[in-house]
Amino acid sequence: ILAGFEHNRRVMIQGFHGTGKSTHIEQIAARLNWPCVRINLDSHISRIDLLGKDAIKLNDGKQITEFQEGLLPWSIQNPVALVFDEYDAGRPDVMFVIQRILEVEGKLTLLDQNKIINPHSSFRLFATTNTVGLGDMTGLYHGTQQINQGQMDRWHILSTLNYLDPSQELKVVMSKLNNLKGEKNKEIIKNMIKLANLTRVGFANGDISTLMSPRTVISWGQNFKIFKDLVTSFNLTFLNKCDDIEKSIISEYFQRCFDIEIDNGESGSAS
């Protein structure tokens, strides 16, 4: 990411959900005092949304049609770090618009306006994805699609962001759970992270199809504060999202970490 900022490289960050891909870029940009704009490339983002469109405006009491620039032309002309989240979920027609600016000196041509935009010297481009552009083989990321390899070739750097070391993850989770202080709560959070790591190993080995991200651990801690019960908060945060066939395996992970048995017949009341 730092190489992207310093040397104007196009950087793509790939990793599982909840690893902090976008946050990582945002925090580095904040420490560099570099303005950062995030665009979520869901399937409803269109070419018009990115490039701009004609809009009706009032001028001296009269309606006139005026071109309104989208976020892409605006970002290119400013010292901005533009981050495309969920890059592998973008529509093909939108991806080809982005392809124009993937080259470092790539100019953006607005055909409707007969205008060519030169990128600002401090414009930077990043993307975050769950896959590496080859489609989703795990079944975890429905809605993602294969990315044109001609476009993938234009990204200068592709880095994978894995889950943190448990000691580092503990610091991150503790910083987000200010209301859970003290050694007793710290030990509980350590075991939460231990359980999360067991689900990640189980997923990697093909034993289970869902895993706990740091985001899930933080949500569990927040729900534990609300419900004052480890099992209830765990059920409501994670276990209820899992396949019934796999719940016994995940319950075993829980027992291993907390020495508490979970009754899989009770998955948390809706009330």
Regions found by a protein language model. Name each.
Residues 1-186, 190, 194:
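AAA+ P-loop NTPase catalytic core and its hallmark functional loops
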Residues 165-170, 174-271:
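Alpha-helical lid/collar subdomain of P-loop NTPases
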